[in-house]
Amino acid sequence: MKLVVVGGVTGGASTAARMRRLDPAASIVVLERGEDVSYSNCCLPYYLGGVVEDSDDLILMTPQAFRVSHDIEVRTRSEVLSIDRAAKTVHVREASGREYDEPYDKLMLAPGAAPIMPRSIRGIDGPNVFSVRNVTDIRALKNFVDRPGVERVAVVGGGFIGLEVAENLRRAGKQVSILEGMAQVMAPLDEDMVQILHKELDDNGVALHLNSTVTAIEDGCVKAQCGGKEVSVAADAVVAAIGVAPETKLAADAGLALGETRGILVNANYQTSDPDIYAVGDAAEGYNALTHTPGRLALAGPAQRAARAAADHMCGLPHRNTGFIGSSCVRLFSQNVACTGLSEKAARKAGIPCDSVLVFPPDKVGLMPDSHYLAFKLVFEVPTGRILGAQAVGRGEADKRVDVIAAMITMHAGLEDLKELELCYSPVYGTAKDVVNQAALVALNVLYGRIRQVHVSEVRGLVESGAYIVDVREPGEYANGHVRGAHNVPLSQLRARMDEIPHDVPVYLHCRSSQRSYYALCCLQGRGWTNLYNISGSFLGISLYEYYNDKALGREPIVDRYNFN
């Protein structure tokens, strides 16, 4: 069998390597348009900040190494122009201009996705505008920003790549601005969780311009429309990290079907509408296992799994395609960020009845010197309790907790399963009742109606309407920051002061993280109160949720002082 692979990096290189392991006699040719066939594209931004010191280290395998190690022929700077499905050939043009036809028995399309560079933005083709797709791109960007006088960099787009580029440019001492078209960075996160990232960016000197539509890139600045007004952001260099679009022209020109998301349509075996042509990676349309709808996911893990499965199918081996759930993580200065499955907004958009809880437990035993809270949000289906997704932000191991949830989602687990999950424990690594266990317990209380809750996003409306809010923290904590108008009835004094809690209006309880207010709620409910609500996330969640928007919008805070500890 002869396999021709169009495109290298994750999908293409993985397909070729797997095929060689399965079939030592197969003829395998990889055709890569760029200069490098296998490189760590996820590590590209870290070259800007010096985490990766030598750009050559980004290159994982050379064509020579593929030949020696795997007997795979790799031809770089070779662009596939067309596919002749009837003749089973691809037409190739080399950098020299020479063109030829390459025959195949099986063809793998792994062209990836191209950075979105909107032509509506005047100056998008300027010499100081860069994208981050490959090693050549990142070398060019670093060479430019290292020039004398290049100090101000505007990053257009607040997704994974945009944030990683911004962080690393700040570490390199640059003045960095992010212009994002939506009301938040990191679209997969819910609004309550992403406010922590907005604060982190602001704390580290990154100027954040949300709801901004870039209109022009000029000498020394970026023009954008924000709230009906034009703003000008100083910039010596611009990084376009708006997003990516699947490279489907080759497939479409060959008459292969495209899917609803405009990715290459594939079946469960990653075959296109031509059974001898496969497609994987960023260009192919996938299947969301939670919403049961088509989707595209530009992540390395799913691309590698798809590449392996496609090679297996070519060789007659069975596999089980379960689709994707979307698990990812990123570091942003001191914060580790991870998410999996559906956010609350995504679940509601998909028509799935759901609820969520927000908890702030310590990531390890509090006596440990580096213990810190971990903001953890768990999304679940109502009334089944099926786990839909999770998000975590904190200085500790956010990815570890979210990986647990990813595994539970894959196994179709529910809150009761998560509650009983037995995990490793040592004071230096976690708590006896881990973050994920605690989140499940709180979620079960909500699911079964043992408690009622309101979310941090609702607190401003409650304060402005004069709602009765009770802060059960100790007086010293209350003095260090509290919700305006809140009544301080410490948990330690609650039993002696129950007569201060009204029965005839809704009462909203909070503490630092919702644990003590839950204890207070149970105490009062046991004595006959039926009008109680726990504020999910409590004062820590309120402070983190309100802070950045208060500062950016210049609005009146609903707290007399923020407290982030």
Residue spans for each PLM region:
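Beta1-alpha1 glycine-rich phosphate/pyrophosphate-binding loop at the start
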Residues: M1-R75, E79, I116, A166-L189, ...
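Mid-to-C-terminal Rossmann-like scaffold of FAD/NAD(P)H-dependent oxidoreductases
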Residues: M1, G7, A283-G396, P427, ...
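Short hydrophobic core segments
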Residues: E102-G112, A235-G243, A307, G385
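A Rossmann-like FAD-binding core segment of flavoenzymes
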Residues: A25-S27, S69, R75-E94, E102, ...
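Rhodanese-like catalytic fold shared by cysteine-dependent sulfurtransferases
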Residues: E416-P427, T431-E458, L462-Y468, P475-Y508, ...
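Glycine-rich dinucleotide-binding loop and its adjacent helix/turn
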Residues: L109-A172, A207, E260, V266-A268, ...
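Rossmann-like dinucleotide-binding cores of NAD(P)H-dependent redox enzymes
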Residues: L58-I59, R152-A154, F160-A216, L299-A303, ...
